[in-house]
Amino acid sequence: YLNHTYPNTVMDFSRAVARADVPVVSHETGQFQVYPDYREMAKYTGVLYPYNMEVFRDRLARAGMSEQAEDFFLASGRWAAELYKADIEMDLRTEGLAGFQLLDLQDYPGQGSAYVGILDAFMDSKGLVSPERWKGFCNEVVPLLLTEKFCWTEGETLTARVKVAHYAARSLQGTGLAWTLRDEQGHVIGKGICPIVSSGRGLLEVGDIRQPIPVTGKARRLNLELAIEGTDYKNTYPLWFYPEDRSTKESHPGITVAKRLDGHVLSALENGGKVLWFPERDRYASQTVGGLFQTDDWNYRMFETISRNNRKPVSPGTMGLLTDPSHPLFRSFPTDFHTNWQWFPIVKQSYPLILDHFPKGYRPIVQVIDNIERNHKLGLIFELAVGKGKLLVCMSDLEAADDK
């Protein structure tokens, strides 16, 4: 559902669970793939040797992207941790679910090499998420935010429900769930307390949040923290707020927007013009891969083989985005260096271009991380000098993505 449903924190499995007459446990939750950390190879000092990692590292070197290995690892891993949070919370939001089970917290280096762990094969942390952050959404008590969306318009009133997944021994009755909305500098935008009146266990209804969002005229990320008073139980959520004026179609002097590089566009480039090009999806289908929002499941090699043998569609097989948040492109689009929820409509309408024949050192502005089998250099947004002009290429149908 994470790859196909507009990001929210209200979906759950309640309807399916209600139809079962036996306890239901969610099986192998997660399994979001992380690009391998080749520094782990030095840990193999005994009888085992990671020949598989050596092969994957050599493939990346042949593709001319060796120096990006750590960036691929961190960007895919940080995003995988957010996906685990979303998947686990969907289980916790489900009334009547008897529990959930991860295959493991660590990587599974067999069966095609499944680097799906938050821990490596030695049960050491990969440094992708702190224990405190993980405990915020995977614990005996978890405060939960229920909202229809992560992206809002300034001037709207932030509305959400709060619940608590409570399975600890002590009662929470008489305590309160404090919520605080802060900007990235830590300034408080709004706060409140919802009293916890239930003495029971399970999924507790707590209250509602209604917070008007002041208009600043700038896109920004805010962080909402939920904390149960007198305890260490707390959970956090990112939210994005954009100015009400979202017009993108007004004319920009000196910039040509095109879907085809025809004679007029090429002439503009030769004469020093600036062009924003949205290549037509069908026209370049053989030179692109599909848009995948989450990181690929388990490992690409195994499920590609299964899909082809059964004549089923093959996953795009990619592992999230890598970009530079300080790039001028993101002045009005706050972002991490990895994928996050605000990217969903853009990525879902994307068709990243294979740039394998570009110079080895060329790097897209927004790069899509490929899997360890193919190692394509994939561009979602990239720029080129053409003649005396500048060409910015966007491999996403932003008109189709503009749905919220």
PLM feature segments, named:
Residues 155-197, 206-212, 220-229:
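Beta-strand-rich binding/interaction modules
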Residues 252-301, 388, 394, 404:
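Short alpha-beta junction capping motif
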Residues 1-120:
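Substrate-binding/catalytic cleft of secreted carbohydrate-active enzymes
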Residues 32-34, 107-114, 188, 264, ...:
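Flexible loop/turn segments at secondary-structure boundaries
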Residues 2-11, 15, 284, 304-403:
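Catalytic beta-strand/loop cores that center a nucleophilic Ser/Cys/Thr
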Residues 195-198, 232-248:
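Short beta-strand elements
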Residues 76, 148-150, 167, 199-201, ...:
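Outer-membrane beta-barrel proteins
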Residues 103-168:
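Aromatic-rich peripheral "rim/lid" segments of glycoside hydrolase catalytic domains that contact
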